[in-house]
Amino acid sequence: MGMDRSDMNKNLAQMLKGGVIMDVINKEQAIIAEKAGACAVMALERVPADIRKQGGVARMSDPKMIKEIRESVTIPVMAKVRIGHFVEAEILQSLGIDFIDESEVLTPADDSYHIDKKAFKVPFVCGARNLGEALRRIGEGASMIRTKGEAGTGNVVEAVKHMRTVMDEIRRVKNAAKEEIMTIAKELGAPYDLVQYVWMNGRLPVVNFAAGGVATPADAALMIRLGAEGVFVGSGIFKSENPEKRARAIVMAAAYYDDPKVLEEVSEDLGEPMYGLEISDIKDRYAERGW
């Protein structure tokens, strides 16, 4: 019997495991990312640090720019749409994007509903702060989950919090008695069958990446040690002094996350990292967008 579209999309996302996905704003950056060993790139007009700095409404990027990036690399290309904006998603699907990120980094288009991702052929990535959010997005059809963190800050603390929360809640479900599953599903606001999957398997039904504030090789290794199966790096690379070297170092850190000697070597002489923000100083908390 043939594999259904949902399983195919989950398998596509599985192929990115262990990798680093980098935000790029043009084809030159995309080529640097691919040469550094990125497993995919995220095409967008402004990295989160600039969206945060400039303010205003952040929307889907220009399809022309996305096409130029897609034509410049051989690795998968992702692009972001606003939460709930299914027409932006239809446009990206039409232009042949590899993955769509329904992203809280862009200004939400709908404050009540997320996109029905099962209506699309292209796989979706979604952010989550906890297990309930993750399972709701998977229930809607997401093929990959990432922490929300706080994008554009260069501060990994929120991503750490979200990853620890998800992993702690997975352990709680795994250790529960079978008769507790329905109550847990009610508490989490998550589909019963997905809570049951977590109870039986001790993990999410899809890959779980880290995102939001990853700025150094050590940050990438930390997130993988905490349970992430790969890492998104947004502003952290191309807002730093030496993007090529930092990109390579973060890819190495994701591969050798358990080897302090390698991490020491790749962390040396990277130049200035991106400017970081204290979370308490931020006006807009992107992670609070969506539910």
Swiss-Prot record:
Which CDD domains did the record assign? pdxS
Catalytic residues as annotated in Swiss-Prot or TrEMBL: K80 (schiff-base intermediate with d-ribose 5-phosphate)
PROSITE patterns from the UniProt entry: PDXS_SNZ_1, PDXS_SNZ_2
Broad class of enzyme this protein falls into: lyase
- Using the record, list the residue span of the signal peptide; answer none if the entry has no such feature: none
Spell out the Gene3D superfamilies in the cross-references: Aldolase class I
Sorted alphabetically, which Pfam families does this protein's record hold?
Answer: SOR_SNZ
**Which sites bind D-glyceraldehyde 3-phosphate?**
R164
Keyword Transcription part of the UniProt annotation: no
The EC number of this protein is 4.3.3.6
- SUPFAM superfamilies documented for this protein: Ribulose-phoshate binding barrel
Catalyzed chemical reaction(s): aldehydo-D-ribose 5-phosphate + D-glyceraldehyde 3-phosphate + L-glutamine = pyridoxal 5'-phosphate + L-glutamate + phosphate + 3 H2O + H(+)
Question: What InterPro entries has UniProt attached to this entry?
Answer: Aldolase_TIM, PdxS/SNZ, PdxS/SNZ_N, RibuloseP-bd_barrel
Q: Which GO biological-process labels does this protein carry?
A: amino acid metabolic process; pyridoxal phosphate biosynthetic process; pyridoxine biosynthetic process
Q: Give, as in the UniProt entry, the pathway in which the protein acts.
A: Cofactor biosynthesis; pyridoxal 5'-phosphate biosynthesis
Query: GO: which molecular function terms?
Result: pyridoxal 5'-phosphate synthase (glutamine hydrolysing) activity
* Keyword annotations: Lyase, Pyridoxal phosphate, Schiff base
Q: Does the keyword Lyase apply?
A: yes
Record-listed D-ribose 5-phosphate binding positions: D23, G152, G213, G234, S235
Query: Tell me, how does this one assemble?
Result: In the presence of PdxT, forms a dodecamer of heterodimers.
HAMAP family for this protein: PdxS
What job does this protein perform?
Answer: Catalyzes the formation of pyridoxal 5'-phosphate from ribose 5-phosphate (RBP), glyceraldehyde 3-phosphate (G3P) and ammonia. The ammonia is provided by the PdxT subunit. Can also use ribulose 5-phosphate and dihydroxyacetone phosphate as substrates, resulting from enzyme-catalyzed isomerization of RBP and G3P, respectively.
- Report the family membership: Belongs to the PdxS/SNZ family.
**Under what name is this protein listed?**
Pyridoxal 5'-phosphate synthase subunit PdxS
Organism (species): Clostridium acetobutylicum (strain ATCC 824 / DSM 792 / JCM 1419 / IAM 19013 / LMG 5710 / NBRC 13948 / NRRL B-527 / VKM B-1787 / 2291 / W)
User: From which lineage does this chain's organism come?
Assistant: Bacteria, Bacillati, Bacillota, Clostridia, Eubacteriales
Q: Which gene encodes it?
A: pdxS
